[in-house]
Curated annotation (Swiss-Prot):
EC main group: hydrolase
The organism of origin for this protein: Arabidopsis thaliana
Described purpose of this protein according to its UniProt entry: Acts as a catalytic component of the CCR4-NOT core complex, which in the nucleus seems to be a general transcription factor, and in the cytoplasm the major mRNA deadenylase involved in mRNA turnover.
Main localization category: nucleus
Name of the protein in question: Carbon catabolite repressor protein 4 homolog 5
Ranges annotated as biased composition (Basic and acidic residues): 31-41
Record-listed E.C. numbers: 3.1.13.4
Amino acid sequence: MSGYERKNTTANSITITKRKRNSISEQSENVYEKSNRKESITLKPHRSFTPGFSQRDCKPVRHSKSSLRRRRRTKEKISSSVEREWVFSANNFENLADKLVLVSYNLLGVDNASNHMDLYYNVPRKHLEWSRRKHLICKEISRYNASILCLQEVDRFDDLDVLLKNRGFRGVHKSRTGEASDGCAIFWKENLFELLDHQHIEFDKFGMRNNVAQLCVLEMNCEEDPKSKLRVRSSDPRRLVVGNIHVLFNPKRGDIKLGQVRLFLEKAYKLSQEWGNIPVAIAGDLNSTPQSAIYDFIASADLDTQLHDRRQISGQTEVEPKERSFRNHYAFSASASISGSLLNEWSQEELQLATGGQETTHVQHQLKLNSAYSGVPGTYRTRDQRGEPLATTYHSRFLGTVDYIWHTKELVPVRVLETLPADVLRRTGGLPSENWGSDHLAIACELGFVNDWQ
């Protein structure tokens, strides 16, 4: 073979090789595009919780114009294919006679959304319309077969009252004090419960801003007698205290946030004692992360304020709107070591608000509370190392968990509604979305009365 032929053959070989590579690349791209078009994201419950969430997922994300366009194009497709599933306790609670499903949901107040549009710059405007969201929220609640609802940021109570009454609920509402229009609401299924007592807390009366909380005593209605088909009242009816709270947001006022939680738990305990030491279930938006000192206070019933900077006690960090980014709660640790400088962060007034006393740095409560979600094994894609959801809210400045359900030992978590993986949430571009009517995800737990099981 001549030198010219060798060169020509080599050139042809290179050309063919390049064509093959291009063909392979084109095929890969076609397969990728097809797989994306057919993609269906379904959350499957794991049998056990496996820690190991990667810190690589914790970095703030800056959205370029091109990425925003891509997110908008794919958002409808992704959100429409996502499902949430129930995961069950490792214990067998199938034989429990008396159970209830408690749902906690921050609905995103209409006025709050309008006043903070920078948080939803990547959300299509139709997804923020209350006329659409209210129906989406009520349909979602119906899917969970809820017995009791603890709702926050409710500023259109009359709308909800009509829609939920049609679904068999009755409710009570308490607006925030001052100029704010939103508040809290507790609803219950009328055929399942009777309201025995109702109290509310206006925190401004205690010098702790205009937030509010609610406490209800509910009694389970009598079951139908299988022979007579009549309702028979039990000599020992099931009763419980249900608490609902929306804690102050301001991360710098950890003294007020801690004080609100303390007072709320004090009132819940007192009401439980007044009705014969009945079980307690509390829920709401605590504006505190699972890594925070406030979370530790609820779980352990004791906290030494001298160990913590009040500006970091809730575990939240602020991000400027111009940064167009979010912070994940699991990327931030709220703990602080003891130092003389930290002691100066708490004035006497701040200590009194937080602890309720004048000459103490410790804050305590008398309820022995367990987190519903940490009591049911989950997946590393949706849970942190404490078993709490990785994210219950997502907007342009925050992706993390601030919503919780807690219960006393007389109640056990039978199952919980798993949240969405953080990576799936990020790919939606932000909440609300096509399928989710708020910037928070509803959290839900089925609770059973423990003496039915033991």
